[in-house]
Amino acid sequence: MAFLVQELANATAARGHEVHVLTGYPNWPVGKPMTPYSAWRPVSERMGGVTVHRIPFLASPNGPLWRRMLDFKSFELSVRIFGRSLERPDVIHVHVPPNEDALATAALAKYFACPFVLHVQDVQPDGAIKIGSLKSQLAIAILRRQETSVYERAAHVLALGVEMRTRILRKGVAATKVSLLPNWINAQAIAPMDRMNPLRAEWGIPEDRFVALYAGTFGRAHGTAQLIDAAEQLRMDTQVTFLLVGQGHDFEHIQRLTESRGLRNVMVREFVPRARLAELQAIADVSLVTLRSGLGNISVPSKVLGYMAAGRPVIGLLDSSSDTATLLRNAKCGVVLEPGDVVGLAREVRALAANPSLAREWGQRARKHVLDQLDAQVVLGRGVEMLETVARGQAVFQ
């Protein structure tokens, strides 16, 4: 989500505000500082109209749970220490998860006697409990208390969609305190392109192949093994290729599944640099999004906006009541199936492969919806106005 923070910071600075970002050193995906940064030396630099303060922490983006917790806790401690050296802000904005960032922000806001805005991307620890990665009742109780404290101390809370907002309200947060601010996308950076592009050529995907693309995180919450099951339904269909691109906890598992089942209609690739995202999105004839059952009001996969901005239809294996499902229905740009319906997914992919005019129509609708509702130029203005309102000590208009 670093690019969302960057774009919001730039938009805030463009309105004439002085903006400081407190963050770590660039380290994704290997967990080591990129040249010329150091893991232990804090540094400040000017990026456009924003001052970025990079502070030390123990990075571990893809390690076991205990390593990632060390990552989060070390950054929390670093924020508490180095954040106090900054000038007093009028308002602090923080993305969560990880919730440790919110704990550090709450402490910093108390130190400076200023308000902070909690921008929720995933509702945690709900997601971790749901997928089974968090089982200790003691740990859950501690995290619940911390969560309650953060919601109480935040001046305002931003949710990505109606269902996510409802889930937050059920935690006892006042309705006047929670507003909707969907994620956005730069529709100029990700725009429709020719499907026959250099990246497709590098990967050797023939022109006549219909490509079903999954691009994003292979996490426990996503249930990406469903895509392998759907591909197996179409293993004899030489027209369709499932292209799975990304990184995450289940990436190697997906590679092994593909190899063990001998699926020649599946290609698994590591994620491409952000500069090539538009090429990647353009390879698709249809794009895929998955979330495990019960996670629809906890998370809103940002990959969907990239799919839609690229002008591609979307098939989702999602809870029908989820914010993502509602987005696809409102845009009239795809199909929503229940999680686990791999037969239905195979059927819909085959149907779109046989009806390219319908695929193009849905893709055009997707692009139009992004331009009208979710383009950065549309959404960022609202986000900056909310921060300005909170900084003035006023109530955010619902």
Model-flagged regions — what are they?
Residues 103, 107-111, 137-159:
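Membrane-proximal helix-turn-helix segments that form the acceptor-binding/catalytic region
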Residues 206-222, 228-231:
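Conserved donor-binding/catalytic core segment of Leloir-type glycosyltransferases
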Residues 222, 273-282, 287-308, 313-326:
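Nucleotide-sugar-dependent
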Residues 35-42, 191-205:
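A short helix/loop element that forms part of the nucleotide-sugar donor recognition site in Leloir-type
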Residues 25, 163, 184:
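Carbohydrate-associated surface elements
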Residues 344, 351, 358-372, 379:
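A short, well-ordered alpha-helix in the C-terminal region of glycosyltransferases
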